[in-house]
């Protein structure tokens, strides 16, 4: 099953990158706009969002050609948000290479991110021309909701960091992830799909938090980058909740400082606290429970459809999260 998922992600990801390439402009100013904005879309990401888009369309009887523009729009929007997120978080690596602002500076990276936001609209406008105004505009409205809710999720997380809020509940984290990972978005009656996406997206994010503690070089992640950035992961929330008063005070002082003022000793303290308080096991079990809920929801949505590779791909995502 993991091979099927990996192969499908590669196939649909390749198709999406090809579709995105058709929307990437060139010309003047190439060096300061068009080359930077094309950087992230050309890097090899996981491509889970566009692949789910294509597989779902095919599982319900549509063609890949019907879904490819929406898949390209989803990935272009995702890359636009990554550019801005990396600046806001002070991240140094993205997909194994320096982040855009590390390569080109913050002003040019912001401009490239803005351009990617605008570029993500072009495939959606093409949908209107191909599907007609009724369906095309519905898809466009869905994407607008995706963007708004993702921005809300980012604002929630940035607010926690700015105000140095550490005393959070699991529900606070899930609410942020629900918005930030774009799964809440819908103006239509798509509740089963929302639940599936939320469970899968939250499990994926939590597993990413775990991978960040000891990243495989293949994933291009910065070692302990989330801790250096002060991200309120479920790991940190759980460790803080079970810490002593003295440990809480130290965490508060640590995360009140700017990223560049945090050092290896600070990271070692947080890692030790996470290990001693059983946060890794707790979070791992939490992620598996969410993945199980995603699998159950997937069966209710896709189980009645004719057997197909796309249906099996969707079912296989819940276990693939932990085997990638």
Language model: regions and residue ranges:
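All-alpha prenyltransferase/terpene-synthase fold signal
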Residues: 1-324
